[in-house]
């Protein structure tokens, strides 16, 4: 089977990760002791993608939990889903990274990284045919961002031909935990541009907006936000976990979604959006799902897709529905809104249909868009970064761990280059003559 090794790192990564395992073990009929108690053969058909089958039909998540302080790990271990995980796969330091990227990447994290790599190797050895890794982390703290990117680099060195997929929680201006978030985020983005194949950008601000506007929650907790993220993650990984009519693995997803290697930052979306514990009263039709799924308010990244253009899109529909109807709906979205899709990539919307809906819903749809508007997210963080970096504010915390100012300038430059690349492809047209003229008369440099 094509296995995926799952890594969750830092406080945010572990909290979302625990929720993710709760959702998918439920979908596959695995109870908290790791025993199968479902009733559909489809649940077991591709269970090996995320679970190891241990002795006497016990299923154990192929998951590695990492943090630089014991707190979050202890709460995951003692939560109701704790017994499901393999005890050896909990790896933690005791010092913490103190929201400092340099501690996670160069000092504290670097001391722990070999222990993590041993567990990674161990997990990879028990795979028949490893397809890749997925890592959940946030970019605003110290461990998820600093040590997370260090781990990505190490895995890249050792398994260069395997897909590296990340779910990265990007800091947002309205919901800030620490002042140095922009530093940590830009230093991480610099690494993600070079070393990952696919990055799903999840944004706390967008999640809060969904909770306030759509779900009408007055004071949303991190639990509510994590619920939304786990819905999306479960949706994105559906076609990897269940047999369906158009099955994707991580590599096929990357081939369909990434037209240029650096432009691999996706906006996820989900429909229908429901609050935790609430049931949906009526089933949505395929046209309603499609319309909601492309709606800016359903996006998990705080960018407006209408201000950019889609390079590529992947949609995953779940539930019993007619594939033909799904195809017709998506075709109509493309023809009615053709200006929002770049014309130089024909057929840039791909669809997968899986018969098993998520718990509590008859039908659902997950959206993955590679839209040039994602640059708004990078511009936002980059502006905050520059404001502090120009005054060298808080820099001593980083240089004290052995970092150099050059690294900051380099990361900022790389992020700004990424923004220009997105802008360039947003403005690009399919006119061949125009392109040839530009080639023929190179502009004179002033």
From Swiss-Prot:
Residue interval(s) of motif MREI motif: 1-4
Keyword entries, A-Z: Cytoplasm, Cytoskeleton, GTP-binding, Magnesium, Metal-binding, Microtubule, Nucleotide-binding
Listed GO MF terms: GTP binding; GTPase activity; metal ion binding; structural constituent of cytoskeleton
PTM note: Some glutamate residues at the C-terminus are polyglycylated, resulting in polyglycine chains on the gamma-carboxyl group. Glycylation is mainly limited to tubulin incorporated into axonemes (cilia and flagella) whereas glutamylation is prevalent in neuronal cells, centrioles, axonemes, and the mitotic spindle. Both modifications can coexist on the same protein on adjacent residues, and lowering polyglycylation levels increases polyglutamylation, and reciprocally. The precise function of polyglycylation is still unclear.
Subcellular location, record wording: Cytoplasm, Cytoskeleton
GO biological process terms held by the UniProt record: microtubule cytoskeleton organization; mitotic cell cycle
Location of the region described as Disordered in the Swiss-Prot/TrEMBL record: 419-446
GTP-binding keyword on record: yes
Tissue expression from the record: Highly expressed in bone marrow.
Any Pfam family the entry gives: Tubulin
SUPFAM superfamilies: Tubulin C-terminal domain-like, Tubulin nucleotide-binding domain-like
Binding site for Mg(2+): 69
UniProt: GTP binding residues: 11, 69, 138, 142-144, 204, 226
CDD domains associated with the record: beta_tubulin
Keyword RNA-binding listed: no
Alphabetized InterPro entries for the sequence: Beta-tubulin_BS, Beta_tubulin, Tub_FtsZ_C, Tubulin, Tubulin/FtsZ-like_C, Tubulin/FtsZ_2-layer-sand-dom, Tubulin/FtsZ_GTPase_sf, Tubulin_C
Function summary: Tubulin is the major constituent of microtubules, a cylinder consisting of laterally associated linear protofilaments composed of alpha- and beta-tubulin heterodimers. Microtubules grow by the addition of GTP-tubulin dimers to the microtubule end, where a stabilizing cap forms. Below the cap, tubulin dimers are in GDP-bound state, owing to GTPase activity of alpha-tubulin.
PANTHER family: TUBULIN (PTHR11588)
Self-association state and partner proteins as the record states: Dimer of alpha and beta chains. A typical microtubule is a hollow water-filled tube with an outer diameter of 25 nm and an inner diameter of 15 nM. Alpha-beta heterodimers associate head-to-tail to form protofilaments running lengthwise along the microtubule wall with the beta-tubulin subunit facing the microtubule plus end conferring a structural polarity. Microtubules usually have 13 protofilaments but different protofilament numbers can be found in some organisms and specialized cells.
Protein known as: Tubulin beta-6 chain
Protein's organism: Gallus gallus
């Amino acid at each position: 089977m094509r296995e995926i090794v799952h890594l969750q790192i830092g406080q945010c990564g572990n909290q979302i990760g625990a929720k993710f395992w709760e959702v998918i073990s439920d979908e596959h009929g695995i109870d908290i002791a790791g025993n199968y108690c479902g009733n559909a053969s489809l649940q077991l058909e591709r269970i090996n993608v995320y679970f190891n089958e241990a002795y006497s039909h016990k299923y154990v998540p192929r998951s590695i939990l990492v943090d630089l302080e014991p707190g979050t790990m202890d709460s995951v271990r003692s939560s109701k889903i704790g017994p499901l995980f393999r005890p050896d796969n909990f790896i933690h330091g005791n010092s913490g990274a103190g929201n400092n990227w340099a501690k996670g990447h160069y000092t504290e994290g670097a001391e722990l990284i070999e222990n993590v790599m041993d567990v990674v190797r161990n997990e990879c050895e028990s795979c028949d045919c490893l397809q890749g890794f997925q890592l959940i982390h946030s970019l605003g703290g110290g461990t998820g961002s600093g040590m997370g990117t260090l781990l990505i680099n190490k895995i890249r060195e050792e398994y260069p031909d395997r897909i590296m997929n990340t779910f990265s929680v990007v800091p947002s201006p309205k919901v800030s935990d620490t002042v140095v978030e922009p530093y940590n985020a830009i230093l991480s983005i610099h690494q993600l541009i070079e070393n990952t194949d696919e990055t799903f950008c999840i944004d706390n601000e967008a999640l809060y907006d969904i909770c306030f506007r759509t779900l009408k929650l007055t004071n949303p907790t991190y639990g509510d936000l994590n619920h939304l993220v786990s819905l999306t993650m479960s949706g994105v990984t559906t076609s990897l976990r269940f047999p369906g009519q158009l099955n994707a693995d991580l590599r096929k997803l990357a081939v369909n979604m990434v037209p240029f290697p650096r432009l691999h930052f996706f906006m996820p979306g989900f429909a229908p959006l429901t609050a935790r514990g609430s049931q949906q009263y009526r089933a949505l039709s395929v046209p309603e799902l499609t319309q909601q799924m492309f709606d800016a308010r359903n996006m998990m990244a705080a960018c407006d897709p209408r201000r950019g253009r889609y390079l590529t899109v992947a949609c995953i529909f779940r539930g019993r529905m007619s594939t033909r109807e799904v195809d017709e709906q998506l075709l109509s979205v493309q023809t009615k809104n053709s200006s929002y899709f770049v014309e130089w990539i024909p057929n840039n919307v791909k669809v997968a249909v899986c018969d098993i809906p998520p718990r509590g819903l008859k039908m659902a749809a997950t959206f993955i868009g590679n839209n040039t508007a994602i640059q708004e997210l990078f511009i936002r963080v980059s502006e905050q970064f520059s404001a502090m970096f120009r005054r060298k504010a808080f820099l001593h915390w980083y240089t004290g761990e052995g970092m150099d100012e050059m690294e900051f300038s380099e990361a900022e430059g790389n992020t700004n280059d990424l923004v220009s690349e997105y802008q360039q492809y947003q403005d690009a047209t399919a006119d061949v003559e125009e392109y040839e003229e530009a080639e023929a008369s190179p502009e004179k440099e002033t």
